[in-house]
């Protein structure tokens, strides 16, 4: 601030250590890794996507995972753009994550989906609060998180619907946190790929 560079050396040393032990690259990085796989029937895709998006918009959630990357890919070249699919792949920030997860479950059940489960995952210190995983059959379609601070986002209008999409710095801060947490339900290569793509 105000031209003060006294902390730059300390920051640079920390950044060098971070890059040494957690480099922002993955040898297995392919565009297919950006999104979670989906083994459900193809006709389920649009119903799940539309249901999750409608609830997220209605509850003013912020998108920051696979779907957000899918939207950002539209600003990339055609080769990159064509690598993305419409697989149900959502990470949401919600003021009331438990309620949001249960609404997704209820609305999908109203559309005749079966075997929908919600898994609660514990938070970590003051960095990550409890969060909820929505699973349809064997496919994880959505994680819902509670914000731990004010997070910046952009509003993107698509067909008169306003989507709150996390800014790149917000997305990267979550992705890096997920890498360090080393939870079994996070695919590190996938997270590194998404981070590389945004960076």
Predicted regions and their residues:
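Phosphate-handling catalytic interfaces
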Residues: 1, 153-186
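General structural signal for secondary-structure boundaries
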Residues: 1-2, 9, 66, 97, ...
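N-terminal regions immediately upstream of nucleotidyltransferase
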Residues: 2-46
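Short linear motifs embedded in intrinsically disordered, charge-biased segments
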Residues: 4, 21-23, 33-34, 86, ...
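Active-site nucleotide-donor binding segment shared across nucleotidyl transfer reactions
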Residues: 45-98
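Short, conserved charged micro-motifs
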Residues: 98-105
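Conserved catalytic core of two-metal-ion nucleotidyltransferases
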Residues: 107-152
């Amino acid at each position: 601030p105000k031209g003060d560079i006294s902390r730059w050396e300390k920051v640079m040393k920390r950044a060098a250590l971070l890059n040494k032990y957690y480099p922002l690259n993955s040898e297995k990085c392919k565009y297919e890794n950006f999104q979670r796989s989906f083994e459900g029937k193809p006709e389920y895709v649009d119903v799940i996507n539309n249901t999750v998006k409608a609830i997220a918009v209605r509850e003013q959630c912020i998108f920051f995972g696979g779907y957000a990357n899918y939207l950002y890919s539209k600003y990339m070249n055609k080769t990159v753009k064509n690598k993305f699919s419409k697989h149900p792949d959502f990470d949401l920030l919600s003021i009331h994550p438990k309620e949001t997860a249960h609404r997704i479950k209820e609305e999908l059940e109203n559309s005749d989906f079966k075997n929908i489960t919600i898994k609660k995952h514990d938070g970590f210190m003051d960095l990550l609060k409890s969060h909820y995983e929505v699973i349809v059959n064997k496919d994880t379609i959505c994680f819902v998180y509670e914000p731990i601070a004010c997070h910046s986002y952009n509003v993107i209008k698509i067909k008169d619907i306003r989507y709150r999409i996390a800014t790149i710095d917000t997305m990267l801060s979550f992705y890096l946190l997920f890498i360090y947490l080393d939870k079994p339900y996070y695919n590190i290569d996938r997270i590194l790929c998404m981070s590389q793509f945004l960076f």
